[in-house]
A protein has these predicted regions:
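N-terminal presequence-like segments and the immediate start of the first folded domain
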Residues: 19-89, 94-199, 203-217, 222-342, ...
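Positively charged n-region of N-terminal signal peptides that target proteins for export
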Residues: 1-6
């Protein structure tokens, strides 16, 4: 296993030293040094999966930073009892799309065979000199890790797999609106791209004996917010019963010809749609395009949530506080609690307000923090300043 003995550099913008794991309920928290003030854990292990926080590294240029990030994540994997061969899913956040090739070359050095699934998008990062951030989900040693390759599709020449199956769970790569069988475009119409994405997802899931009905979580990256409504019209047609939990953000992709990339997680088993009550206790209302949360087994996948109101319209801290209150009501409705959170992603429209968001975040989550990434993107709400999406495990 390729691991350099480096200090972890993450979103706290300081060097951190890992210390032994702590246990909280059904999750194992991989802790940093107690002197760290970071409101996220390096990793959280729960069930068969290990959730690793978004991680940065210092260095000159994309290649040096990408190696530093992957070495840092390798140290966290080692502390969790795993290594690179157990990684199932990676999300790569690049400051500049021009750094894609350099990042890709380094990534391939670490994942030379049976690589994980991967999503790569352009976002803002918390540190001005940071060029790349990566977060991961890994599979505990001893649990199944099977690469999914649809029949008739050419083997991927890029360092990622189309799908990874572990037990009842499938992680899909970020899927684009093209015909993967022939590696050809389906045109620039957003609805055609959306339909192509779900046809591709259907074929990947079929290899595992699963279908779109098993999808529980969806992260949607769209390049132009004016396309959101048309995308939704095509999207909702694929989930007539229980739509997955979802977050949708504006982000640039690695190819200018594409307007949409979607990352999915599917879990076989009986699903329960969670509809949270309103703040005043009245019944909540279902959305045709997403579930507030989806419960399957001992896991809960929550949609990205916002906290926009007349009082918080220009207040990032206020929006974060209201968002986390909404998340709390959603957890309660599902029979979960804050301590069950294992993984999250925070989308901010202005990364200079990262500290303001964290004030509210620490009020709601006071210890045994979930793993977390925090990046800068556009949101679908014109007044939205922060959106937060979580996974919980009991």
């Amino acid at each position: 296993m390729r691991i350099m003995k480096l200090a972890i550099i993450s979103l706290s913008v300081c060097f951190l030293v890992l210390e032994p794991s702590a246990f909280q309920g059904g999750k194992r928290v991989i802790r940093r040094d107690a002197s760290s003030n970071s409101p996220f854990s390096s990793a959280v292990a729960a069930g068969d999966f290990i959730y690793l926080s978004g991680t940065l590294a210092r260095g000159d240029g994309i290649r040096e930073q990408a190696r530093g990030v992957l070495d840092n994540l390798g140290e966290v994997l080692e502390l969790a009892g795993a290594d690179y061969s157990r990684v199932a899913s990676v999300t790569v956040y690049l400051r500049n799309t021009s750094d894609f090739q350099g990042m890709n070359e380094v990534f391939q050095e670490y994942f030379q065979s049976e690589p994980p699934t991967r999503t790569t998008v352009q976002t803002d990062l918390v540190r001005e000199d940071a060029l790349v951030e990566m977060s991961m989900i890994a599979i505990r040693p001893g649990a199944e890790r099977t690469v999914l390759q649809p029949q008739g599709w050419p083997a991927s020449t890029a360092p990622y797999s189309y799908g990874i199956k572990s037990g009842d769970t499938v992680f899909l790569a970020g899927i684009l609106g093209r015909d993967y069988s022939y590696n050809s475009s389906v045109g620039s119409d957003i609805q055609a791209e959306t339909r192509a994405i779900f046809e591709n997802a259907r074929q990947i899931l079929a290899v595992a004996g699963m279908s779109l009905n098993d999808v529980v979580a969806s992260r949607v990256y769209i390049t132009d917010t004016t396309l959101f409504r048309d995308m939704n019209a095509a999207y909702s047609a694929h989930f007539p019963d229980i739509p997955p939990a979802r977050a949708t953000v504006r982000a640039n992709l690695m190819g200018d010809q594409y307007h949409l990339e979607i990352t999915l997680i599917a879990v076989a088993g009986t699903k329960t749609r969670i509809t949270r009550p309103n703040a005043d206790g009245t019944p909540g209302r279902e959305s045709p395009v997403l579930s507030h949360a989806v419960r399957v087994g001992n896991r809960l996948y929550l949609s990205g949530m916002l906290g926009v109101s007349d009082e918080t319209r220009t207040d990032t801290q206020g929006q974060a506080r209201q968002t986390l209150a909404t998340i709390g009501r959603t957890l309660d409705a599902a029979g979960f609690g804050i301590d069950d959170l294992v993984d999250g992603v925070v989308y901010l429209t202005d990364m200079s307000e990262w500290g303001e968001m964290n004030v509210a975040y620490r009020e709601a989550i006071t210890s045994n923090f979930p793993a977390r990434a925090a990046v800068g993107t556009g949101l679908m709400s014109g007044d939205g300043r922060v959106e937060i999406m979580f996974t919980a495990v009991r």
